[in-house]
From Swiss-Prot:
This is Homeobox protein Hox-D13. The keyword Cell division does not apply. SMART domains: HOX. It comes from Homo sapiens (Human). Residues 85-115 have a biased composition (Low complexity). SUPFAM superfamilies: Homeodomain-like. GO terms for biological process: anterior/posterior pattern specification; branch elongation of an epithelium; embryonic digit morphogenesis; embryonic hindgut morphogenesis; male genitalia development; morphogenesis of an epithelial fold; positive regulation of transcription by RNA polymerase II; prostate epithelial cord arborization involved in prostate glandular acinus morphogenesis.
Amino acid sequence: MSRAGSWDMDGLRADGGGAGGAPASSSSSSVAAAAASGQCRGFLSAPVFAGTHSGRAAAAAAAAAAAAAAASGFAYPGTSERTGSSSSSSSSAVVAARPEAPPAKECPAPTPAAAAAAPPSAPALGYGYHFGNGYYSCRMSHGVGLQQNALKSSPHASLGGFPVEKYMDVSGLASSSVPANEVPARAKEVSFYQGYTSPYQHVPGYIDMVSTFGSGEPRHEAYISMEGYQSWTLANGWNSQVYCTKDQPQGSHFWKSSFPGDVALNQPDMCVYRRGRKKRVPYTKLQLKELENEYAINKFINKDKRRRISAATNLSERQVTIWFQNRRVKDKKIVSKLKDTVS
């Protein structure tokens, strides 16, 4: 039998005892006296039933109990109904206080003046969720009006099952609100991966990839952290050449460091990126001798001759063609200088 049902049965027994003319017990009279003196029982205590000998005394006791309940802020429904029934007959028992439902204390609504004087609320916290096989990242930012004691007052606020205080930077924020011009907006990025029980924080300079989504699951847009990466690595690809020095130490790094505290590497010890032409490689004496002999025979070459020279000198056909072009330009410069000296 439920608690409400047991209370109803006790009320019926009290009504039957009052009709038979049984006198009220000492405990009932003491409870009625306590209610009359302004004391109120807690809402978790057992219900109190009082049998009275006269309707006027029952009405006075019920009124005193109702006044005490109103003064303490708790309302017990059903009291007015019992008091109305007690005034009809002097032999009927009256229930002084019968809690039918857990008492609820309503909070007063804020006045318009208080709402207007309230500071602007802080930006809402972005919560990340972990549905199925998906990967969801979230960004929590806090700025104006965020208080440290507000975080302490809500310890149950969580981010995917983890407390918000663990991943929010509250250093420098006092118990009072900080003006907007003194506190910059700070944020921490937290990511959740499939198969991991706890989130982790991002490290600048690393790319976060998205796990495979199953069929029927919505695909959400993920972000890629690109701090520390040069723009040319992705925009231009690897079409251009990258050159490194010959005697390169073991600890040299190619990527630029994204942490401001790191010491910059020396220029000769690191690889150099060049978008221009290749580094000039001088030809050997045998290659130059073969090219000079062919140039002395004919300053212009055809396709067959170019292929034969390329096979003999171990050079590409393009290198052979460019060498002949440069050799002709050199002859023109020599001739022009001779003319200038003669004139």
